């Protein structure tokens, strides 16, 4: 199981890559074209605190990737004990949580290397879509960038 501090470190690392790709939106798993390739020409040779844009305490843990549109980072997280899902939007410059929606769920057996938050959201200029499932349901929820639920 991934620890909260490890989750924060991984999140900060991914965010650095997303921030460095500046003009390129990171809209889905493996980026804009699904190939895991960024327009970033080089990465830091050594990792240090000066390369981190922000650190933010997040609820739960997750194995999904954050996505980026403009100045907003969207991600899915979940409580490893209760399976409660956390749909989050953060300011890409400060790490401040701009909005959050929490959804109760039921626990169930997971793959050894999975979590209750394994699906990466997708985002475009108008909406962000999150998905997750439990043994009885599959949930797909769309939100505006301001956090208003558009459909489920």
Per-region residue spans from a language model:
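Bacterial N-terminal signal peptides
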Residues: 9-19
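Noncatalytic, solvent-exposed loop/strand surfaces
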Residues: 21-152
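Bacterial N-terminal signal peptides that target proteins for export
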Residues: 1-11
């Amino acid at each position: 199981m991934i620890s909260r501090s490890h989750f924060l470190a991984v999140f900060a690392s991914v965010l650095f890559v997303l921030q460095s790709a500046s003009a390129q939106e990171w809209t889905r798993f493996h980026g804009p074209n699904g190939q895991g390739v960024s327009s970033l020409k080089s990465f830091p040779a050594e990792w240090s605190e000066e390369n981190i844009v922000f650190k933010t305490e997040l609820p739960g843990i997750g194995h999904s990737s954050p996505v980026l549109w403009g100045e907003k980072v969207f991600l899915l997280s979940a409580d490893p004990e209760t399976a409660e899902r956390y749909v989050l939007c953060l300011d890409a410059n400060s790490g401040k949580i701009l909005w959050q929606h929490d959804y109760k769920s039921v626990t169930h057996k997971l793959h050894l290397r999975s979590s209750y938050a394994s699906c990466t959201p997708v985002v475009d200029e108008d909406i962000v879509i999150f998905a997750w499932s439990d043994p009885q349901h599959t949930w797909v929820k769309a939100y505006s960038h301001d956090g208003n639920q558009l459909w489920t």
